[in-house]
């Protein structure tokens, strides 16, 4: 039997790594469009600032094609480079498009009509066509300019410092909209918190803030252009310098890159952090064994992908689908339950997915609450802690946990309650019990008339829900709350694996019956000792 299990472990790992074989066929080269990118060989701040505004207008233009916008983005992202023509070669590594570099020397009469280099093959008609694109600004932009301040384009940027100020401000906004361009394009393109952070740090000048519509158009252009995202990935790798003496631009790119790394892989890394990182004995459940092998294979698979693995979402890599939490739903549900107790930042993460198992989520919550005072034996041994030190630490953690709660009440962290999150009465030292019974859900739309009776009346609401008068103890007590709260079994010295597994099975069965009892009194509660039925209780989508 052991040989079968070892073979299964090797098979699971090989199944994830087999796509990395060296004998895989070379993909067929597809037809590539030609993208024209304007570059400047001199460092004149006046000409470079004009090229910056020209590229912004091409991105906003009503009549510009996707290739025009991609070329304008590449030129915009290369403006800080002293040698734009050489820097743009990074985009030539992309298999998505062919890059045509067009050298220009300036603009005619402070307009958006470019002056091509003498060696350029750009015709006069093409020059006039690009000028028309730059002038065709959408009506959704106020004052026919991408900036909030309508006189920014009239400024004279005759100093390098002034040009770099506007250049870095615009580029940082482009990098900010990149953070969610692939994972959440329906949300506002710019995070208010990120904008406030970089303005406070002096990396974005408030005078050069773009209009929200301009930020949205830049995000759409980045989302639709694979070659631009390839170029930005190369820039992110260049910013990962081990030296602390980096130039200002790449220091900013490296900072914003932390928000882009592992985008779309939050479920995988949070499962590793809270599910495996805590190393609590609940992981010994037999139901977790198969998914633990899957997580082990995924960790090896991630390491084999190299440094580009952090940007799989930005690169639209199909390998990102290997790491979705639906491949390990029980471990994911258990880890999310732990995370909601230990980390307040988890409230900002949308973990309520269709594959979230309620019972294992509850198991994670109960485990985290009962293990908050537990001591890691390995770390305690390294620190030389005695048994008295461990007991004192556990007591301190328990006091701190109770002191943070309202007196005589325990919070409910029900992820399925939505806007109806509430507190349930109970003693401060009791373990709270989740109640998914919809009869206990407070409603605000069940009134007798459309007049003054629709105003929320706490006393009437309490009587309707059989909760007594406001300020009085709750009269409605479910059977679940009256039942005992079994402690999570702990594996003691001398306990065999079978005994510990049997104890955990009994605990899961008790939890299951406890939560299900209030929903269906006629349900068949008879379960086999070796086969625990974990059914979803209630409607998750409600």
UniProtKB/Swiss-Prot annotation:
Residues 295-402 are annotated as: P protein-binding 1. Forms the helical nucleocapsid (NC), protecting the genome from nucleases. The encapsidated genomic RNA serves as template for transcription and replication; encapsidation by N is coupled to RNA synthesis. Forms the encapsidation complex with the phosphoprotein protein P. Before encapsidation, the newly synthesized free N protein, so-called N0, is chaperoned by P. It holds the Pfam family Paramyxo_ncap. Residues 472-498 have a biased composition (Polar residues). Ncore is globular and carries the regions required for self-assembly and RNA-binding. Ntail is an intrinsically disordered monomeric domain in the C-terminus. It is found in: Virion; Host cytoplasm. This is Nucleoprotein. GO terms for molecular function: RNA binding; structural molecule activity. Keywords: Capsid protein, Helical capsid protein, Host cytoplasm, Ribonucleoprotein, RNA-binding, Viral nucleoprotein, Virion. Residues 403-494 are annotated as: P protein-binding 2. Disulfide bonds: none annotated. It comes from Human parainfluenza 2 virus (strain Toshiba) (HPIV-2). Residues 1-294 are annotated as: Homomultimerization. The gene is N.
């Amino acid at each position: 039997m052991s040989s079968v299990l070892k073979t299964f472990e090797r098979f699971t790992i090989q199944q994830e790594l087999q796509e990395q074989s060296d004998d895989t066929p070379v993909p067929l080269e597809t037809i590539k469009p030609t993208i024209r990118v304007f570059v400047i060989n001199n460092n004149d701040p006046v000409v470079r600032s004009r090229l910056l505004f020209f590229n912004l207008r091409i991105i906003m233009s009503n009549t510009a094609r996707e290739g025009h916008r991609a070329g304008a983005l590449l030129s915009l992202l290369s403006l800080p480079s002293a040698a734009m023509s050489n820097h743009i070669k990074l985009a030539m590594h992309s298999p998505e498009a062919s890059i045509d570099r067009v050298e220009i020397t300036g603009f005619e009469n402070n307009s958006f009509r470019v002056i091509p280099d003498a060696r350029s093959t750009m015709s006069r008609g093409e020059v006039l066509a690009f000028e028309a694109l730059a002038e065709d600004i959408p009506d959704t932009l106020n004052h026919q300019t991408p900036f909030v301040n309508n006189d920014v384009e009239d400024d004279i940027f005759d100093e390098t410092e002034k040009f770099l100020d506007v250049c870095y401000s615009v580029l940082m906004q482009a990098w900010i909209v990149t953070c969610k361009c692939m994972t959440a394009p329906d949300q506002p393109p710019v995070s208010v918190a990120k904008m406030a952070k970089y303005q406070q740090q002096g990396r974005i000048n408030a005078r050069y803030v773009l209009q929200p519509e301009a930020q949205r158009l830049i995000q759409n252009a980045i989302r639709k252009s694979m070659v631009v995202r390839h170029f930005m990935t190369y820039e992110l790798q260049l910013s990962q310098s081990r030296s602390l003496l980096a130039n200002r631009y790449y220091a900013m790119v490296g900072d914003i890159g932390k928000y882009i790394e592992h985008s779309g892989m939050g479920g995988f890394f949070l499962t590793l952090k809270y599910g495996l990182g805590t190393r609590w004995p609940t992981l010994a459940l037999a139901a977790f064994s198969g998914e633990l092998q899957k997580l082990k294979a995924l960790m090896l698979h991630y390491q084999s992908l190299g440094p580009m693995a952090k940007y799989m979402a930005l690169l639209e890599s199909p390998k990102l689908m290997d790491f979705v939490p639906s491949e390990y739903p029980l471990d994911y549900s258990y880890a999310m339950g732990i995370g909601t107790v230990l980390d307040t930042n988890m409230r900002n993460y949308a973990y309520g997915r269709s594959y979230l198992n309620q019972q294992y989520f509850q198991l994670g919550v109960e485990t985290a609450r009962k293990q908050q005072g537990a001591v890691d034996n390995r770390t305690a041994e390294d620190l030389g802690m005695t048994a008295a030190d461990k007991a004192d630490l556990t007591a301190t953690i328990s006091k701190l946990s109770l002191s943070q709660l309202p007196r005589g009440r325990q919070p409910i962290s029900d992820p399925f309650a939505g806007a109806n999150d509430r507190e349930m009465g109970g003693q401060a030292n009791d373990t709270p019990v989740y109640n998914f019974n919809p009869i206990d859900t407070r409603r605000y739309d069940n009134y007798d008339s459309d007049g003054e009776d629709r105003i929320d009346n706490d006393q009437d609401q309490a009587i309707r829900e059989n909760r007594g008068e406001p300020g009085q103890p709750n009269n409605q007590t479910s059977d679940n709350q009256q039942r005992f709260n079994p402690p999570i079994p702990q594996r003691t010295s001398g306990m065999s694996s079978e005994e510990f597994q049997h104890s955990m099975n009994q605990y899961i069965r008790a939890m299951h019956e406890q939560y299900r009892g209030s929903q269906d009194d006629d349900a068949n509660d008879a379960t086999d000792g070796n086969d625990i039925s974990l059914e979803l209780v209630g409607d998750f989508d409600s």
